[in-house]
Curated annotation (Swiss-Prot):
Family per record: Belongs to the NPC2 family.
Assembly mode: Monomer.
The protein's role, per its UniProt record: Catalyzes the intermembrane transfer of phosphatidylglycerol and phosphatidylinositol.
GO BP terms: intracellular sterol transport; membrane organization; sterol transport
Record protein name field: Phosphatidylglycerol/phosphatidylinositol transfer protein
Pfam families hit by this protein: E1_DerP2_DerF2
GO MF, one annotated term: sterol binding
CC annotations in GO: fungal-type vacuole lumen
Gene name, Swiss-Prot/TrEMBL: npc2
Signal peptide: 1-19
Protein's UniProt keywords contain Transport: yes
């Protein structure tokens, strides 16, 4: 559950905090592409691995991320992650708004789910919907689990208002180099 929260936080919370068990929903399957982050996508300002989606018409977006700072960046297994963000919300974000999240571990899709933006925004930042247009600055801290399998995770999050209005699309790639525990020399 904490890793799902991390995935949400790294891609969606910075966007939807204002608008409002990792392995609990497996959806294994092969993908034609492992890169959800395109080299032509626009990087979101700040200390973070996030970009706006390359194949997304940002002219129709109603949520603009001014910056996201992750502390530490990159995130570390078994440590706290603090997320600082400023978002410009250009439309009223309604109850029933949602984000579709896809997470790939290499070629394998391990998460493919729809989350309620308002529920998550309230859970993580005490933000209630509907959220009126404006600039919102927030900070949140989450605890990452130690047992994050090593490798590269590719995350894609597309968000829509309850009426189907496009909010935004964000992608990110994060690598973890170990499970978060140290090997102990048992020869002594």
């Amino acid at each position: 559950m904490r890793l799902t929260t991390f995935i949400y936080a790294i891609t969606c919370l910075p966007i939807f905090i204002s608008a409002s068990s990792w392995f609990s929903s497996f959806s294994f399957g092969e993908s034609k592409s492992t890169d959800l982050v395109s080299s032509t996508s626009e990087k979101i300002p700040g200390a973070n691995p996030a970009s706006y989606c390359a194949d997304w018409d940002r002219g129709d977006d109603h949520v603009v991320v001014d910056y996201i700072n992750l502390i530490p960046n990159p995130p570390a297994a078994g440590k706290n992650l603090t997320i600082e963000t400023e978002i410009n919300v250009g439309t009223t974000v309604l109850n029933g708004s949602y984000v579709d999240i896809q997470v790939k571990y290499g070629f394998v899709r391990i998460v493919n789910e729809r989350l309620d933006i308002c529920d998550k925004a309230y859970e993580l930042a005490a933000v209630e919907c509907p959220v009126e247009p404006g600039i919102i600055t927030k900070q949140a801290t989450i605890s990452l689990p130690w047992a994050i399998p090593p490798g590269r995770y590719h995350v894609l999050a597309t968000a829509y208002n309850a009426d189907g209005e496009q909010l935004t699309c964000v992608s990110a790639s994060v690598s973890f180099s170990h499970f978060g525990f140290q090997l102990i020399n048992q020869d002594h």
